[in-house]
Amino acid sequence: MSDIENKNENLELELEDNTILSNLFGINDRNLSLIEQINQVKIQYRGNKIKISGNKKSIFETKKTILNLFKEAQNGAEIDEDRIRDNKSLISINTKTDKQME
């Protein structure tokens, strides 16, 4: 990896519906911890504001994961480890496909 890919960056998100966050974050923030572990990022939040820290690619994938899972939670889905891992797999496949098309 180049120095640019290893450089830590930050991204802030704001999610509009606080009632969904407990489902998204999980009991004792278990879902957030899993997302951090899978994507090798650090996630901090206060209320509906989320800060993601890590390398650029990991931040991008984490943002996509959180937004996808948030939409699923809005539609009534229970967010659990399997759903998080499935979402990560889809994002990884789409990212690889996008790079191949470039």
Predicted regions located by residue number:
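Structured loop/turn residues at secondary-structure junctions
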Residues: 16, 27, 54-57
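Interdomain "pre-motor" coupling segment immediately N-terminal to P-loop NTPase/helicase cores
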Residues: 44-102
